[in-house]
Amino acid sequence: IFTKIKNIEELNLAIANSSKPVMLDFWASWCVACKELEEITFKDEAVIAKLQGFTLLKADVTANNEDDKALQKLYGIVGPPGLIFWDKDKKEVTSSKIVGYKNPTDFLQIVNKNF
């Protein structure tokens, strides 16, 4: 289950309060690849099992307001979907950054390298 965050402050607070690694999903209602991630990748049993070990956050950037733009700029996300990861020590794991749709196999291959 994803917890929605609206800005950098909420993101930082969520990361600080997490005892697990964190995954942030940049999402928008008009984003076809975001829907594919939700309907295919995030419903895969192996992916579900893997993500149980994470705090899951979602930034809905549909409105593309100033907070949305600031979050995307901070993490180099031009547009959704984008997935950013932090380890349990609250350090960003840039080698696990995912931009665009990934099927369950490719998603797990990237995430399993570091987690």
Give the positions of each predicted feature.
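Proteins that catalyze or organize thiol-disulfide redox chemistry
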Residues: 1-55, 59-115
